Amino acid sequence: HNQNLVEERLHFFSLKNRHLPVWCTEAYKINVIQNITKQINQSKITSTQKILLQNLVNNVYANAKALNAKSYADQIAITNYLLWQNLPNCADNAMVYLEMEQIASELIQKFHLHKPTIINQLIFSEVGQKLYAENYHGISGAFTNDPPHGSFLFWAIQNKMRLALILKDGYLVNEETNYKINLDPKIVSDKLKSRELIPTTALSLSIISFYYGLTCGGGFSQVDYLTSMKWAYLNCASELNNETDNLLIKNTITNYLVASFAFLYLNNNLASSIDWILYQKLEAIELLQQNLNQITLNQAFQTLLPEFYHIITGEFVDPKYIPNIIPILYLT
């Protein structure tokens, strides 16, 4: 936020690219950093804040490892890790963000192309495909036929845009573009390597959470659809007589909520992590630590209910109805 408390954004790419999948977005180069510097110089913040912001860009986004990364997704993993460490009192944080779809893609290629696992059967066998179609239909993150929504097992990438696929006669097809791919292990493997195919959210989570048993935390929507996916996967495993997978998944937790909490404000606006750097005050740092040690999870969560309301309905809550539940730290 600038001195007028108006949100300003630094754009790495043109806004026309906002709908492009991260999966196929190319890595940014040094010229992007140079453009960011120009945007910082034109922003309505103090000269001291411009220096702080430029230092952040240099330390995080102009980092040599980030600039040498092969893809934008790899850059995000590196820069988010570095961003956490550049926040006040957060130097010891080791938060790593990885691309779920890439993990699922590599696991398919290494372990599920030919071995008769439940994942192999769901993707490549006619019986498994039919079971997937019956059990995952209508689940958010999977697919719906009427009205058409989501994609069956994979998304296709053509001209840097996602294509939704349906199952038709053993092929994945997009009828609007005549795109067609045979669900053959060699073909699917090649398309995953070239990043022409992306595992859907449903397939990715089924592999990571259900087949391998990793606990996957997520937002308030995920705890709903991940639970639905678990029962869909269990039904498929039962029909395929895959008892080993069946036993493993029964202990998988699907309601692990991971949510943001609001602690910092600029006047009456929620402050971002970048604001925390630009408007940092020693007394605010001390008060934040005190707040984190004293407030309850319930109190912290309730501060974001208006934000959840906006996400779900598209409408904003009148500030007079927002309860002052926890002590608010003002950076200005």
For each of these PLM feature ranges, what is it?
Residues 189-190, 196-212:
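Short, hydrophobic/aliphatic alpha-helical segments
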Residues 215-218:
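Short hydrophobic beta-strand that contains or immediately precedes a catalytic carboxylate
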Residues 182, 186:
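Extended active-site and interfacial segments that coordinate phosphate-rich ligands
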Residues 1-30, 192-194, 206-207, 222-293:
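Catalytic or ion-translocation cores adjacent to nucleophile or general acid/base/metal-coordination motifs
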Residues 39-179, 191-194, 212, 267-270, ...:
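Aromatic-residue-lined binding/catalytic grooves and analogous aromatic/hydrophobic interfacial grooves
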